[in-house]
Amino acid sequence: MPIHTRRRIPSRFAIACAASALGLGCLVGAGSADTRTSLRMAFVGASTDLAQRFAPADAAARVALGPGGADVRVAGDLMDGVALRVEALLAANPQARRIHLTSGGGLVEEGLALGALIAEHGLDTYVPDECASACTLAFVRGRARYLGTAGRLGFHAPYEAGLFGQTFAVDASPERAAYRDAGIAADFTAEALAVASDDIWMPDAERLIRAGAVTEVVEPDRFPDSTLDDDDGPEAARAQVLRNLPILAQADPAALDRIAAWYRDGYRNGRSEADAFDGLRARANDHLKVLFRRADDATIRALGHAALAASRAVGAGDGDACEAIAGGDVVAIDEALRHAAHPVPSLPALIVQARRQNAVPTEGAAAGDDARPRRHARRPPARCAARIAALRQALDRPAREAAAEVRGLLLTEAPQVAAIAAP
C-alpha cells in the first residue's frame, strides 16, 4: 500500500453533492470560478470521506517483539492503531533498542506518530526489505538508520484517495517538516515530495546516505532475520522457503515441512537472515542428494548432463557457482539452469522421477532437524575446472560406468569446515 493518506471531514452538503451522480447535479449552473473551485473542494472532501466510510479497510501492520526483547518488528500497512500498539509494546519492554520496519506505506498520521515514538525511545531503525511512503516518516526518526543490502526506501508526494480510485494532491507540509526535523537534506526532501503520488522514487543507498536518510548499509548477518515479520506461522514459513528455493516444490512434502520448521524455529530464536539462508540451502541440498542417491542410472546420467549445462550457464567467471555445481550442489545447479539464457530441461522433472524411484527415505543427521547450517570448503578454480572436465569425460563412457562415475563426482559428501553457530 504505497500511499500517504490523510483524513478530512467534509460537510454534509459535500457528501450529498458527491453522492448525487458524482456531484454533477451540484455543478449545474455553477458559473463563477470561485463557485467551481468551492464545489470541486467539496467533492474532493466528500469522495475521500466516502472512501474512508465504505472502501474495504486495509489490514493494519503486525506488531511483535523479537527474541530477547531487543527488536520490535512492524510489518504491513501503517493503519489506525499501529503506533498505539507499538507504544504499548515499548512500555512493557523498555529493553527494546531497535525496530524493524517492513511497510509499503499507510496513514501519514501513523507514520508521524510511530516516528515520534522511535525518537522518544532512542530506537535504531532497520529496513531489511522495503519501507515506502508513510513508513519513511518513521524510519528517518531512528537514532541510527540501517538499510539492508536488499532494502529499499520509497518516496512520493502525499495524497488522499477517493471512493472511485481518484487521487487528490494535498499539502505536503507535515512530511516536509518531518524530514527536516530528522536532518534530511532539503534538496533530497524537495525531490522526494515532487514525485507524483501514483509513482515511487527509490534512491540508491549512496544517495540515501549522502542525504542523511540512512546511516549505514548492513549485510543480512548483522541483525535477526525479518523475513517472517508479517506472519511467522507454519504456512508462511513454508511459502517463504519455496520462494527462496522453488526447487523444493518437487521435494518430499514431509522433508519440506521439516525444513520450514527449522527455518521458523530459527526466526523465533533470533537467527540471522544470512545463517537462515545458508541453512535452508544446506538442508535442501541434503534432501535432494538423498533422493538422487537412490535414483536409477538413467536419472543419474541426466543429472550429470544438467550439471554440465549449469556450468556452461554460469561460465568460468563465477568461481563460487562453478565450485558449487562441480561439488554436486543441486540447488546451485537448479539456479543456474533457471537463469540460463537458453534454458535446458530443468531439474524439477528429474526430482519427480527420483522420488518415484525412492521409498520415502529415512534421512540421516545431515538432513535432519538438528543439523546445523554449514559452509563447504572453497575449492580453487583449477580444481573446479578439473572436476567439470572429469564429469564431461564420465558422461562419454558406457551408460552403467557413466552413472557410477557421476555418482562419485556429484553425490558424495563435500568437505566441510566449521559449523555456523545456530541459536
What do these predicted regions represent?
Residues 312-378:
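Extended amphipathic alpha-helical interaction segments
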Residues 67-71, 229-325:
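N-terminal Sec/ER secretory leader and immediately downstream segment
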Residues 33, 44-85:
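STAS-typified acidic loop motif
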Residues 16-25:
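Bacterial N-terminal signal peptides
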Residues 119-162:
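Glycine-rich beta-to-alpha active-site loop
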Residues 94-110, 124-131:
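Short, glycine-/small-residue-enriched flexible loop/hinge segments at domain edges that mediate gating
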Residues 156-236:
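Charged, glycine-interspersed solvent-exposed loop segments at helix/strand-loop junctions
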Residues 252, 375-423:
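A cross-kingdom marker for long, charged
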